[in-house]
Amino acid sequence: IKAGELVSYELDQSFFALYNRKLAGTQVPVFSLRTRKSAGIGDFGDLKTMIDFVASTGQKVLQLLPINDTTITHTWTDSYPYSCISVFAIHPQYADLHALPELKDAKARAEAEKTRAELNALDKIDYEKVNDFKINYLRQIFNQEGEKMMKTAEYKAFFQDTELWLVPYAQYSYLRDKNGTADFNQWPDHQVWDEAERKALADPKTAAYKNVAFFYFVQFVLDRQMQEAHEHAKAKGVILKGDI
């Protein structure tokens, strides 16, 4: 092909194999799967309980509404699951806190359990309070366990596999929270994201790095928990069907 030439291919018809099989299933948003141990909202631990129910009733498919991060304003308007800020990042609200290491500080642990129980006793999900609580709890776990966890081979493999989207997502999330708005046009700096910007915010020696790394940590935790739920479904013979 020479410069200026155009080659066009046209495929008149496409054929895809259609399997002559009907499967019964259920469609749910994960946030609706509250159980007695939840923190005011359904999470990946509750998802495994739902998988057990689907399997026990002879169903074969469990379809989930999108689980992507939708955090823009940190208000209830972020609750619409189809308004995601990333096609890869998972919403922190789905973290199963019981699957995380226990808080070592007894007072902090007692306060967290009190708040969890209060949120879970509400008739309806308080989106803002639930997410504030979960982010605060995840930060405490990050401060306690993050440095050690991020040195593991498992985390390093995760980071290598996801770096292409994880780094810009984490840096954007940090700058969104730092500047109090998701509208980068209103930020005093970092309005243009390029390689120089990426390197500056990814440098462990900078003051911003720990806040950026927090989002790496949260996505690692969520990825592991979702993987566990997927393996649980596989073991139960249940298909997990996603939605975007």
Predicted regions and their residues:
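Glycan-association/targeting regions that enable binding to alpha-glucans and other polysaccharides
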Residues: 1-16
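Acidic/aromatic-lined carbohydrate-recognition and catalytic surfaces
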Residues: 18-244
